[in-house]
Amino acid sequence: MQVRIADYPELRKLCWNRPPEAVLDGADALALYERNWRHVDPEALEANERALIQSLATRYGGGVLNV
């Protein structure tokens, strides 16, 4: 699974040091969310980003988001 940083506002904040058009491997995206969850505003998550995080957790995290 490939994740385009520019498509997800909270992920874009976590990847401030990468170009917005960059694409991450799904496992790397999940690792970024998990490692930096303290910087994610859950209230600001859009529906598509919530769905992405759930999909990543299911696919790469055994159904669990480790935060």
Locations of the language-model features?
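N-terminal acidic leader/helix
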Residues: 1-27, 31
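Amphipathic alpha-helical segments that form the core helices of the histone-fold
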Residues: 30-40
